[in-house]
Amino acid sequence: MIERFTNASLKCPICNAPTALDGTKTLYCKGEKKHTYDISASGYINLASPKQCGGGDTKSAVKARSEFLDCGYYKPIADKIIELLMKYSNKSATVIDAGCGEGYYTTQIAKNVELAIGFDISKFAVEAAAKRAKREGIDNAEFCVASIFTMPIFNESADAVVNIFAPCVENEYFRVLKSGGILLVAHAGKEHLMGLKQTLYDSAYENDARADLPTDLELICEENLKYNIQVDKNANVMALFAMTPYYWRTSQNDAKKLDGLNSLKTEIDIIFSVYRKN
């Protein structure tokens, strides 16, 4: 598993030099100053710059989201991602999961491709992702703490980039994609989580169209996935709420409407947009 770090085209975030393994516990750069990066016991590596460290999801948020996703509510989303990757890329692909979080999607991608690389700015999320991969016996998924705005990987290193409910950084994705590579963006449709919003707000509203989708890549496919879920247990309801942007926009009075709510039926409405770098 550790050897995969040498196959991932990772570069030093400080001097941009190529990297190599020094034994099994350290990655070092081949630049003049030989910057070193320890590989954690969990199997991930921190390549975030000092200014970027400490950001992203908290440990408790990562734990709650992991438990929610492990219930299978979003399994159809993962299945659709794999379907589209296999249709527009191939099993020998190197795939970057930009904003990989706890690795729920990354590990499933890894089961179908040559190499999956997950980047996320939260060290708690990346640690959870690395532990998930170990737990599931996956040896072709590597995880790095790093910003998706400046990923520590060389130009044209990836056959595909997957962006799932994360900021869409077109210039950076264009840089790391090989010619002919694809970008797969999974984003909320108009009615996504409408049942949750109807519970929270007096006047529920449809989601706006996403404003940061690529303009310089060729759109080759767009598909819509819709289904309903019944979320059981208040902990799962609260975890779902915390995963959404509504969590940060909702007043305390409205948020209290979820207290003690042990069942929630809501819509899942996801748009999958596939772009190609020509």
Q: Whereabouts are the PLM-identified features?
A:
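N-terminal auxiliary segments of SAM/dcSAM-dependent transferases
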Residues: 1-55
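Conserved Class I S-adenosyl-L-methionine
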Residues: 7-8, 225-278
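Conserved class I S-adenosyl-L-methionine
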Residues: 92-101
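Conserved SAM-binding loop of SAM-dependent methyltransferases across substrates and taxa
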Residues: 102-113
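Conserved SAM/SAH-binding beta-strand->alpha-helix loop
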Residues: 122-124
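A short acidic, Gly/Pro-enriched loop at the edge of an enzyme's catalytic core
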Residues: 149-160
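A short glycine-rich, Lys/Arg-flanked "PGG" loop and its adjoining helix->strand segment in the class I
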Residues: 170-182
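Conserved beta-strand signature within the Rossmann-like core of class I S-adenosyl-L-methionine
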Residues: 181-191
